[in-house]
Each structure stands twice: as C-alpha cells, then as structure tokens.
C-alpha cells in the first residue's frame, strides 16, 4: 500500500493516471457490512446486514429513511453516511416546499453525485468513505441506484456492496431474469438469499442482524427491524450446506469454524 508521494493528497495524480486517495475511500466501502438492493416492476427492496461493535453495543442501523418515497442503505463510514442522508432529506424537503411535489429519484442521485465530487477535486479535502444503495419509487417506477466515493453513480436492476459482496452479486446475476416478474414476498426472499451468501458457512441470518427496507407503488418507504423481519425469515428455506468429501467430513467443520469473517 506504499504509494510514495502520489497518495499525499486527493489532487495528486500518479503516473498511471490514478488518484490513490479515491481508491482508499473505495476500500472503506469494501470494509463495511454487506447490503443488497433489487427491484421488480412494482417494488424496490433493500436488505442489509447489521453489525454490532461489541456484545455490549446495539446493532448499527444500516437502512435510513430519506423521504416517503426514498430510502438508502450504507456500506462504509457511518458518520459520512449520516451527513449525506441529512443532505438528501433537506433536498427532498426543499422540493416539497418549493414545487409541492416529491423529488424525482434520479434528480436526487444527481445532486448526491455533484456533492460527493467536490472533495475529490479540492486540496485539503477527502472523499466520502461510504457507498450508498438508493431505493425509490416515482412516476418512472421503482429505482435502485448505487453511489461511490468517486462520485460515480449507476442505475441498477440489482446490486450489492460491502464486505464479501461479490458472492451476493454472483447470486443476483444468476437470478436477475426472475426479479422483474416477482411479487413483493419473492423479491424480499431473493434479497435475503443474496445477503446470506456474504456470510461465513457457520453463520446465518437472524432478526438481530438483518434489516429490510421496502418501497413501491402505493407503498411508502418502510423499514423492518428486529421482530418485524421474522415473517420474511420464516419463509426462507435453510441454507444449503457445502458438500464435503467423506474422508474429510468430520474435519472440515472444525477448520471452517476458525475462518474469520471479513470486515
């Protein structure tokens, strides 16, 4: 990770045409707990894995309410996410006050992109170390957007960010053709299955470590936590076990139990 003089500030380019401070901020997103977003023709769903700093601490909130038609899930620095969430709430309030209408989701994402681009260009600033999945519903239908510390943003049919998110993205790519025709219950189950792929073999989803956000046609953005998640988890089949060779069947569980969870 030694970059010599090329990672001292966000305004310094390396000879390879890279800005290392932005790449470091992208790594912060990969250290956050995983979150998944996906949509059908009528709904957009966010599913996030909550993490507790210690056994004495409560689980951190991973899904935040922005407006009646928009919510976000986060991966990365929570403090940066809180600041961006407050900015988004203010923009939504301004739209309702000035224009008497909800702010279109794509317009809000564009404003976030403009705000997060500023610290990637100015001396003495650092990029926001958080990635967002934005779920919303407007006149154009349901939306899932991804934003990055580099100020890029993408309109997605499904996406996952955070630690071990590649496993979730593999699941989403494999089942992406099914999402558009799913009803709400099936869509949430797909999100939970994708999120479960990010966990080690010895762990599973529970009401304590999962949060769900749903928005759709005639449905305001709603967050489900703790016991409210139970109906969705109850309908989820058990996690399939990895196949092992007969001679190693007794040894492998002990070996896998020692594998640390990626942070």
From Swiss-Prot:
It holds the Pfam family Proteasome_A_N. C-terminal extension is partially cleaved off by limited proteolysis leading to a conversion of the proteasome from its latent into its active form. Its main location: cytoplasm. Residues 253-263 have a biased composition (Basic and acidic residues). One of its GO terms (molecular function) is lipopolysaccharide binding. Induction: Up-regulated in liver tumor tissues. Up-regulated by the antioxidant dithiolethione (D3T) in liver, lung and colon (at the protein level). It is found in: Cytoplasm; Nucleus. There is a cross-link at residues 115, 208 (Glycyl lysine isopeptide (Lys-Gly) (interchain with G-Cter in ubiquitin)). The lineage of its organism: Eukaryota, Metazoa, Chordata, Craniata, Vertebrata. Residues 232-263 are annotated as: Disordered. Detected in liver (at protein level). The modification N-acetylmethionine is found at residue 1. Component of the 20S core proteasome complex involved in the proteolytic degradation of most intracellular proteins. This complex plays numerous essential roles within the cell by associating with different regulatory particles. Associated with two 19S regulatory particles, forms the 26S proteasome and thus participates in the ATP-dependent degradation of ubiquitinated proteins. Keywords: Acetylation, Cytoplasm, Glycoprotein, Immunity, Isopeptide bond, Nucleus, Phosphoprotein, Proteasome, Ubl conjugation. Belongs to the peptidase T1A family. One of its GO terms (cellular component) is centrosome. GO terms for biological process: immune system process; negative regulation of inflammatory response to antigenic stimulus; ubiquitin-dependent protein catabolic process. The modification Phosphoserine is found at residues 110, 177. The 26S proteasome consists of a 20S proteasome core and two 19S regulatory subunits. The 20S proteasome core is a barrel-shaped complex made of 28 subunits that are arranged in four stacked rings. The two outer rings are each formed by seven alpha subunits, and the two inner rings are formed by seven beta subunits. The proteolytic activity is exerted by three beta-subunits PSMB5, PSMB6 and PSMB7. Interacts with NOTCH3. Interacts with ZFAND1. Glycans are attached at residue 110. SMART domains: Proteasome_A_N. It comes from the Eukaryota. InterPro entries: Ntn_hydrolases_N, Proteasome_alpha, Proteasome_alpha-type, Proteasome_alpha1, Proteasome_asu_N, Proteasome_sua/b. This is Proteasome subunit alpha type-1.
